[in-house]
């Protein structure tokens, strides 16, 4: 059965960005990172899920490139963690990957990152015990390094 997620209206997009900013604050505090802003990527951008600029500005795509439907919140958090890792390592080398997975693990421990979970508009739940990380990164994580 195909999962149906709504198209994003401006209010929902604003709420997602607010939620990403709150979650980012929890993550950067742990790692001593600083970012300038998190905003939604323009709807027409299809070549990337997110971008981190040298000045600390982060843009995250909230919509699927072809359907325009909301991406799952876990996908947005995955992208957020990836872009936060770029605040320390501006490449995709081994140190970047290790740091990215460390941020992702912390997001999982805080209950922010829940892969396979809820669509973007799902209500925020209380943090739960961290899931055990497998020895291999998930395919969704590796695809970010394409």
Task: Name the predicted role of every residue range.
Residues 83:
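Walker B catalytic acidic pair
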Residues 1-78, 87-146:
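Active-site-proximal or metal-binding-adjacent scaffold patches in catalytic folds
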